[in-house]
Amino acid sequence: MNMPVKVEYFKNPKNRDLTPAELEAFAKELDQIKQEVLDDLGEKDAKYIRRVYAAIRYSSFLGRACLFAGWFPPAWILGTGLLGFSKIMENMELGHNVMHGQYDWMNDPKFNGQTYEWDTVGTSDNWRQTHNYKHHTYTNIKGIDDDIGYGLLRLFPEQRWKPGFLLQPIYSIPFCLLFQWGVAIQNLEIGRVLYKRKTKAQFLEELKPVNKKIGKQLFKDYVFFPLIAGPAALPVFTGNLVANGLRNIWTFSIIFCGHFTKDAEVFPKSVLQEESRGHWYMRQIRGSSNLTGSEAFHILSGHL
């Protein structure tokens, strides 16, 4: 009979618990900052996101144009780099932030957080569920926030150790290279299907929009553009493949830096009992890590 193992949760010695009064005051301060930011939104912000959108469109067009001359190695390298840059920008600085509703106030359909569809095999609806709701509501709560290792990686000592994790340095490499595919199937909860906690019929129903999006993305990058490239079909195909790989490596790296560094904390489900807004704010801080770099770095990382 397996005895339950008591988990000791790491508490960063740099942090201290706040009193209820301090938490209430803390929440009011952050709410005030939020309101000040909302009140300050205006034309400069609209111009910024439109410039980002234009940069993505132009870099994608130029990258694909260069790949049409991809038999010439410098053209292939430049085209692949531009296309990879475009995909990174679209996912990180445009798609991620737009889907958080940051630009809903513009009332521009292109930047509507509920309808925006991004350039990756995963559906935006699934991302809004797994990331916007589940991850940001239950940040770093063990057993709820799937971002803690995505069910594949052991990132904290609070996670139960299994012998298979010895292979983690090996299988994390293909996971990194194929990261968009992991994001695409995250909300399908395949593990629950295998353990009979979700019916096959429910799984197949949820799989339909995923398959549709995957088919659309594969057709665009690996059928349509290679076909219209004619003699340059092969360099266009490989350029798209490498550009997607570059995007996967970058997004994997940035996302794993955000919540899984040595000072970040993991929390038990019990913290949700009577959790106030101040507690929630504090959990976001204690479970997250800062990223610092150049302005270009912050743009490419979506200002996380």
Model-assigned labels for residue ranges:
Residues 95, 99-100, 229, 251, ...:
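Membrane-water interface at transmembrane helix exits
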Residues 26, 30-37, 52, 174, ...:
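Generic structural signal of hydrophobic/aromatic residues within well-ordered alpha-helices
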Residues 46-91, 166-181, 206-253:
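Alpha-helical bilayer-embedded segments of polytopic membrane proteins, i.e.
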Residues 2-62:
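Low-complexity, highly charged intrinsically disordered N-terminal segments
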Residues 13, 17-24, 118, 122, ...:
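Generic amphipathic alpha-helical segments used as scaffolds and interaction surfaces in large
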Residues 243-249, 255-278:
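Active/binding-pocket-proximal capping segment
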Residues 85-204, 272-304:
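Membrane-embedded catalytic scaffold of the fatty acid hydroxylase/desaturase
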